Amino acid sequence: MLFRSLSGLLDDLSYNSARKVENVALYEQGRVFFRDEDNERPREVEHVAGALTGLFHEATWNASKKPVDFYLTKGIITFLLSALGITRGIRFEATAKHEEMHPGRTADIYLNDQLLGFVGEIHPNLAKEYKLKRTYVFELDLEKIIAAPKGELVYQEISKYPTIPRDVALAVPNEITN
């Protein structure tokens, strides 16, 4: 299942990086084709893949810069699955079986005992080939996700008082008129 959707995303990251756009996050949804020994035609499976490199967000006055890493990418996947109603039975299992991936920074994603996909950092040799810095990718089988049993969605009322991420007060002496 590895890299059926991701090679195009890595090409796009490389294109952006060559033009000095260092902080990029992309995703792609589409069909992946598997050779089926029993049939002439390949089997089509709907997948979603993503690739992130650089900073997740720049430094601001109240937060330091946050580079993309394994745990951030894993969190994006967990959030996506949760938004789709899959909150139980997800586990991430470390693996070294994907040769294009960094052996110590890759995990297969399971729903109960069913393989959904993988997440991890691309192998340094592959990153060098694409002229990329640390890059994290994931690929998920959408058909298995759609077919998975979903938890009950719970409505949560929106607060009447919106949050304010920034509150600025200026103290100006009375002598200043303009």
Q: Which residues does each PLM region occupy?
A:
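Extended beta-strand-rich architecture
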Residues: 1-178
